[in-house]
Amino acid sequence: MATNYKRGDHDSRPWGTWEVLDSGENFCVKKITVKPDAILSLQMHNFRAEHWIIVDGEAMVVLGEDNLYRHKDEAVYIPVKTKHRIKNTSQQVPLTFIEIQTGDNLDEADIVRFEDSYGRVK
């Protein structure tokens, strides 16, 4: 399989927005914007790894059992099947980061949620 994303795909979520900047065989690049004080679900992916690069703002990243703090120009790598989430630690400024997904099957359906502030855990 490959990516099910195409350039220009976008969506709004309770925590902010995402937009596909580029995609190809086994990769996808997204720009993700997180509202002030918002947090994404604690989740993992069965088929993809992710690389996050902070472009603007400050973040707290849960990676497995660790809490990491990242600022502009810093990055984090999320291996396949690793629980993770990101929180915008600012009360006023949006957090923007670039997400690079790599794997054999890239699809929005590859999200296993464990905790979610917006009632999306199944």
Predicted regions span which residues?
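Double-stranded beta-helix
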Residues: 2-13, 85-122
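Short hydrophobic/aromatic-rich beta-strand segments that constitute the beta-sheet cores
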Residues: 41, 61-63, 86, 99
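A short glycine-rich, His/Asp/Glu-containing loop-to-beta-strand
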Residues: 6-44, 48-49
